[in-house]
């Protein structure tokens, strides 16, 4: 679309996006009618202009992606590309877990657009980790849970994450200690113990996701938790918590009394 044009054809945008053109969206994604002028859009109602005037909270998820992409490719309008991205992943949060190959087959997403999206998503993840490093995680359980939901809550396969903490419960290092399938995963406590020693960690928070979304721990989750807790006790490292992570909720072994 031509940036210098004062008016943008509304019908063309609707056909390209498969939805109503960007409007006065709220942060919750609810749309309010856009000011129209004889079936056309004023330039002031385009996503970039509205963001600069009112802030990012007024934009829909589709419009945010439009601004990140900047433009489409020949034959692929940027609004339709943004909508297809959301349809593929289901939400912006799920996009944060995407890999390079997850974007394969999407119309209008070439190598440059893939790299751009992945770089922005990595910046978001690193920003969250930096926030965790600046505080005692023992006093910030919500921050830990929000980060883990964002990092692994939407993953299609099971992932086991270890957060190694210092004596003041500040984050030293976070890593994925194991990856599995849709329903099972092999975690080796001795490897986590070895890693804790190498990082000189004083305590540890571990977490894994349930791709099904149900966060109730299994019998094997409980066995692993107690085995790992006992192994860490032998080297004087505290297991602060084991979290089972879903897209929208988290189960805490510590809050549940270590069943």
Swiss-Prot record:
Question: Can you tell me which family this protein belongs to?
Answer: Belongs to the UPF0758 family.
Instruction: Print the keywords alphabetically.
Output: Hydrolase, Metal-binding, Metalloprotease, Protease, Zinc
What broad taxonomic lineage does this protein's source fall under?
Bacteria, Pseudomonadati, Pseudomonadota, Betaproteobacteria, Burkholderiales
Transmembrane ranges, per UniProt, are none
Q: What is this protein called?
A: UPF0758 protein Bphyt_3148
Species for this entry: Paraburkholderia phytofirmans (strain DSM 17436 / LMG 22146 / PsJN)
Domain MPN, which positions? Answer: 137-259
- Cross-referenced NCBIfam families: PRK00024.1 (NF000642), radc (TIGR00608)
Q: What biological process terms from GO does the record include?
A: proteolysis
Origin, by domain of life? Answer: Bacteria
């Amino acid at each position: 679309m031509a940036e210098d044009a004062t008016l943008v054809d509304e019908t063309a945008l609707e056909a390209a996006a498969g939805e109503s053109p960007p409007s006065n969206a709220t942060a919750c994604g609810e749309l309010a009618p856009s000011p129209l002028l004889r079936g056309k859009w004023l330039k002031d109602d385009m996503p970039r202009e509205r963001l600069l005037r009112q802030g990012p909270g007024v934009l829909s998820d589709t419009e945010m992606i439009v601004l990140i992409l900047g433009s489409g490719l020949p034959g692929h309008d940027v609004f339709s590309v943004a909508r297809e991205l959301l349809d593929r992943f289901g939400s912006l949060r799920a996009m944060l877990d995407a890999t390079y190959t997850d974007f394969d087959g999407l119309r209008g997403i070439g190598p440059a657009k893939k790299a751009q999206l992945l770089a922005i998503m990595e910046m978001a993840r690193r920003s969250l980790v930096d926030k965790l490093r600046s505080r005692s995680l023992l006093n910030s359980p919500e921050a830990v849970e929000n980060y883990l939901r964002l990092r692994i809550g939407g993953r299609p396969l099971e992932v086991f994450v270890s957060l190694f903490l210092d004596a003041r419960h500040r984050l030293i290092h976070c890593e994925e200690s194991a990856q599995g399938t849709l329903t099972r995963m092999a975690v080796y406590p001795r490897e986590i113990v070895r890693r804790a020693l190498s990082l000189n960690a004083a305590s540890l928070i571990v977490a894994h996701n349930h791709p099904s979304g149900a966060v109730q721990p299994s019998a094997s989750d409980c066995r692993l938790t107690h085995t790992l807790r006992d192994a860490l006790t032998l080297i004087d490292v505290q297991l602060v918590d084991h979290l089972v992570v879903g897209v929208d909720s988290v189960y805490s072994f510590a809050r549940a009394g270590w069943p």
